[in-house]
Amino acid sequence: MKTSKTKPPKSVLIAGPCVIESLENLRSIAIKLQPLANNERLDFYFKASFDKANRTSLESYRGPGLEKGLEMLQIIKEEFGYKILTDVHESYQASVAAKVADILQIPAFLCRQTDLIVEVSQTNAIINIKKGQFMNPKDMQYSVLKALKTRDSSIQSPTYETALKNGVWLCERGSSFGYGNLVVDMRSLTIMREFAPVIFDATHSVQMPGGANGKSSGDSSFAPILARAAAAVGIDGLFAETHVDPKNALSDGANMLKPDELERLVTDMLKIQNLF
């Protein structure tokens, strides 16, 4: 395995709430993230979902929807100067979301959906493909190649450098470990960095899917531990969901970090990356 990469000079940081709750809530989080966004060592993206289409229960809050959600993300982009990440679940959403978002994310459950990957790849946005909890990390090269060949039909095999050049990233978010639990195999980070830049999702990796009577639970106290380990193994950036009041968040509150907790985590991550 190769251990050195021609990687970007800055570490990527993708941070924000799980789902858009309101414009006021987005602003309250965006303000708290300004110190991180202004850190010269970070390439910062503000994230939030306009629709959580894969919630466990029909009764769970999903978000404001495509049109209203993108309007609010555009306001955050203009007011704070932040670059934006949001996820898309259906092919028709890609071209519309790309008018606002700098990164379009493919959810983990949809990481093999060819039509969705192709449609997102036809936009100018960076693509962040989350590794499915059920996926062999080696097999994520085929999802990467779908995106790369859509953007450049001459590409025959995925490499880290080619994926970096064409804006195709992968995101590790844990693997299924029996029912209702996830575990992170740190080997996945090195395996996937053979053919794409890799972002580590620290907060979804501590999720316990379906563990709370119709919704997911988790333990955010483990997120900093896993993130520090991932930084030591070697990653291109960190994904972490954050909220000013995680206990009352409308989605994934058990996994999210408060902004000050995230800031301490990122400080640790950068120190670890300095060692390599």
Swiss-Prot record:
EC number: 2.5.1.55
SUPFAM superfamilies for this protein: Aldolase
UniProt keyword annotations, A-Z: Cytoplasm, Lipopolysaccharide biosynthesis, Transferase
A GO term from the CC aspect: cytoplasm
GO terms under biological process: keto-3-deoxy-D-manno-octulosonic acid biosynthetic process
Disulfide bonds: none
Primary residence: cytoplasm
Protein's UniProt keywords contain Transferase: yes
Family: Belongs to the KdsA family.
Name of the featured protein: 2-dehydro-3-deoxyphosphooctonate aldolase
Organism annotation: Helicobacter pylori (strain HPAG1)
Classification lineage: Bacteria, Pseudomonadati, Campylobacterota, Epsilonproteobacteria, Campylobacterales
Gene responsible for this protein: kdsA
